[in-house]
């Protein structure tokens, strides 16, 4: 009975809820709320499902990285592992980077030496450089497959030996594979690339050490052409293998000619090109690019160089070879060595290339600036060329297209420094922050030169507030200033009469490793001792001078020991006297005799003035004795002044009389 009643109630409730739902739906359709209006069947639009976009695994990281800017208070990204080991000087930074690179090379050696212990890949996404490389050939038989493997591994000597074995065995090697071998030999020469790179690193380190000492403003980055002076030997493996070809094609000639140009065999390259034409073959764009770059080496006069360039371009047109960006850059690079003729032809060449839809790259603009602005020469070119270049490149993000792209920013900043154009320097630096343009800064050496020129121009052209703003932004997060740069900063402080900042700058000098640079230290002392300031500034100067004294007394291993000069002793003493540090100044006066230095008469007169204010007659007489001991010509005048301005006892009068007689007899 109870169960039948409950079932009846449940059935009635369900029926009531259905009736209520139907009623509500009818009432909602009569209302004007758009959210509940049923769309018309005829007005339905077809839903188009967009195509799936595939994102790289680094896309999120790249998006996050684009939202932040460089933190001027943070260290370089390479130094984030251990903040306690962060270098504070340029030499420490170089040592740190080399040590870090040495550690990477050691790790890479063990990974490649014992690959079986590093088979599991933990990195997500995959990082190829953390996994073992295949450096040893797996195929030991004498076959084309084994030769192809050695070419891919860039084993120059092993590939040449295997090629000779194939020919001795009577096995013919395909022309394409032989051309691959020629490409390898002509690129690396007779040596394997690993050995070549090691030697290049050693020579690069030696060159940087020399240039760091001798060049700061006039320096340039070491180029590969300076480091690798491999010569093209006659009848080398490339020429021998090329001679064994029964019917060499254009690619064979291209490899040989490009190799000759790369290794400075320019005359042989043009001779080989003549052989190509005699065999009724057409050159490709790579051959013409190499020959255009070699023009300055085979023609001595400017007009002859330009005529040869025109002749090569005409031959390109006759052979229907379309030029590319590297063609433009090769022409501009050759025009850099054509003097005034190059300046007259540079813009027409760029205009002609633009007609062919060839847009200049950063390397093109770098060559253009080098054509119009000679490094180290008296600048007579109007700055509108620099302005036109910056108008073309401003706001653009560039991608690498030419190895010389990395030279643009250094060249542009050098031109800004030579022309004293601060506005364009700001534009160059602004361009550096657009997109991934920072990747074109090149090596650490190039980066240091770029910032050295930029900072030197700031010190020369801007007021000290702007200079200090950039100084705090750049140092030491991206730039370790040299002693010359710190000297420029001191001159900027002197120009704007902000010598009160010298104590802060001195602390930075010590931190940056310039505390033992005697010329720079003496410049700091001279500026502080030159004129008097308010008592607060004089107190800070005195503390700074006493701190500098410690640098003279410090004898740390591996650091240059500074020697006291008469001017440095006089400057420190003058600074202490100006701050009413008489006792400390008196101790400094004793150092003149200790280091065999002679104080100036002006310094002794300053001492007499301070002693007079304190009423210390004994010290005044002692000053006269010191002057007489050094046989200064001003001693008689000093005796007379003490006799007139001080109340002397009989003992003091007798001492001065004896000194006066000794001085007279000495004269």
Swiss-Prot record:
- The primary location reported for this protein is mitochondrion
Q: Outline what the protein does.
A: Mitochondrial RNA-binding protein that may have a role in mitochondrial translation.
Report the domain of life of the source organism. Answer: Eukaryota
Transit peptide limits: 1-11
For this UniProt entry, the molecular function terms from Gene Ontology, in alphabetical order, are: ribosomal small subunit binding; rRNA binding
Mind telling me what this protein is named?
Answer: Small ribosomal subunit protein mS39
> Which UniProt keyword terms apply here?
Mitochondrion, Repeat, Ribonucleoprotein, Ribosomal protein, RNA-binding, rRNA-binding, Transit peptide, Translation regulation
Q: Per its UniProt record, what PANTHER family does this chain match?
A: PENTATRICOPEPTIDE REPEAT DOMAIN-CONTAINING PROTEIN 3, SMALL RIBOSOMAL SUBUNIT PROTEIN MS39
Q: Indicate the family of this protein.
A: Belongs to the mitochondrion-specific ribosomal protein mS39 family.
Q: Where in the cell is it found?
A: Mitochondrion
Which processes are annotated in GO (biological process)? mitochondrial translation; regulation of translation
Q: List the disulfide bonds.
A: none
Source organism: Danio rerio (Zebrafish)
A GO-annotated cellular component: ribosome
Q: Where are the PPR repeats?
A: 249-283, 284-323, 324-360, 361-400, 482-516, 565-599
Q: Which residues form the signal peptide?
A: none
Region entry Disordered: which residue ranges?
Answer: 199-226
Among Pfam families, the record links this protein to: PPR_3, Rib_mS39_PPR
Coiled-coil ranges (or none): none
